């Protein structure tokens, strides 16, 4: 049994991606009530509500004894909770339960993609500290991307992601790869400046993006470093492999096609101005400044070699 918490708050959206959110809540609360003496279930009706609730928890207007917060949802909802906790300097740990199309960071936490199994796993999970990115004042747990990764997400949004789920990503990937939009960039990583032209650029904290693992052995969201990847726009094969999620790819061995630079402080400007995807939400534009906040967040993590 995991540690006993005094008062946990479980946040959820009605449109979380689960087939039946209320049935899902019933399954999840079975596990969470064994971890918390008191469990509050809080609906987030509008974007930004979770951040407001976190502010109320910080000011002890919600309750004076909250010592853990849970989220049932996809990466965008997780991102909102991360911002709520860090922006309000709320010194409480987080438990994440997958409930969206992609749940990249729950893979990093060794959690099952099934919400019911994942909530069961939380009972035997332990707290670990994770790095967080701060991007123009917004907190980001997993990745920052621009170029093809934004185009792909927008092509999905034009379709019916809510109905087709992951299937919608396949058609949009083909559409995206056939029409890449190039841009000029100036990227500074610590003291190193790079200039060039590309169709995709990614800065990763976590090792999983878009439903699959970045094939780079030493990528960790606990090492105090961020990893920038610049993709050669001419290398269609590599881009195709990246989007088709071929697990056999090893980016460590690729010298032509992907530039990889690790560092702690990043600035990025582009021409033209580009939209920026943060953890699946397209909410920023270039120029951006990114810094790593080492071990900024405590998150429940399932033991790596434990039985799923």
UniProtKB/Swiss-Prot annotation:
DAGKc domain sequence ranges: 1-139
Active site: 281
Free-text comment on the cofactor: Binds 1 Mg(2+) ion per subunit. This ion appears to have a structural role and is required for catalytic activity.
Cofactor dependency: Mg(2+)
GO biological process: phospholipid biosynthetic process
EC number: 2.7.1.-
GO CC terms in record: plasma membrane
Highest taxon listed in the record's lineage: Bacteria
Class of this enzyme: transferase
InterPro entries referenced in this protein's UniProt entry, alphabetically: ATP-NAD_kinase_N, Diacylglycerol/lipid_kinase, Diacylglycerol_kinase_cat_dom, Lipid_Phosphate_FormReg, NAD/diacylglycerol_kinase_sf, YegS/DAGK_C
Binding annotation for Mg(2+): 220, 223, 225
Keywords: ATP-binding, Kinase, Lipid biosynthesis, Lipid metabolism, Magnesium, Metal-binding, Nucleotide-binding, Phospholipid biosynthesis, Phospholipid metabolism, Transferase
MF terms (GO), sorted A to Z: ATP binding; ATP-dependent diacylglycerol kinase activity; metal ion binding
Pfam (any one): YegS_C
Protein purpose: May catalyze the ATP-dependent phosphorylation of lipids other than diacylglycerol (DAG).
Name assigned to this protein: Putative lipid kinase SH2167
Source organism phylogeny: Bacteria, Bacillati, Bacillota, Bacilli, Bacillales
């Amino acid at each position: 049994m995991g540690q006993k918490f005094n008062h946990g708050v479980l946040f959820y959206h009605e449109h979380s991606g689960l087939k039946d959110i209320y049935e899902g809540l019933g399954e999840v609360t079975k596990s969470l009530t064994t971890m918390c003496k008191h469990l509050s279930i809080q609906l987030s009706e509008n974007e930004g509500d979770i951040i407001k609730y976190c502010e109320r928890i910080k000011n002890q207007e919600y309750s004076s004894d909250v010592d853990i917060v849970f989220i049932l949802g996809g990466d965008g909802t997780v991102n909102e909770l991360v911002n709520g906790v860090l922006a309000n300097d709320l010194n409480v740990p987080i438990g994440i339960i997958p409930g969206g199309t992609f749940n990249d960071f729950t893979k990093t936490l060794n959690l099952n993609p099934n919400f019911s199994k994942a909530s069961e796993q939380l009972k035997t999970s332990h707290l670990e500290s994770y790095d967080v990115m701060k991007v123009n004042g917004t907190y980001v747990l997993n990745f920052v991307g621009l170029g093809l990764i934004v185009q792909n997400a927008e092509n999905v949004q034009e379709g019916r992601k809510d109905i087709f789920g992951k299937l919608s990503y396949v058609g949009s990937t083909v559409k995206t790869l056939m029409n890449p939009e190039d841009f000029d960039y100036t990227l500074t990583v610590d003291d190193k400046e790079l200039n060039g032209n590309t169709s995709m650029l990614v800065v990763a904290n976590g090792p999983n993006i878009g439903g699959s693992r970045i094939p780079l052995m030493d990528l960790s969201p606990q090492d105090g470093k961020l990893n920038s990847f610049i993709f050669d726009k001419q290398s269609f094969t590599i881009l195709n492999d990246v989007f088709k999620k071929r697990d056999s790819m090893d980016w460590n061995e690729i010298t032509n096609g992907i530039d990889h630079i690790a560092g702690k402080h990043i600035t990025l400007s582009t021409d033209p101005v580009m939209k920026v995807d943060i953890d699946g939400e397209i909410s920023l534009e270039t120029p951006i400044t990114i810094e790593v906040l080492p071990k900024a967040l405590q998150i429940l993590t399932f033991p790596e070699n434990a039985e799923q």
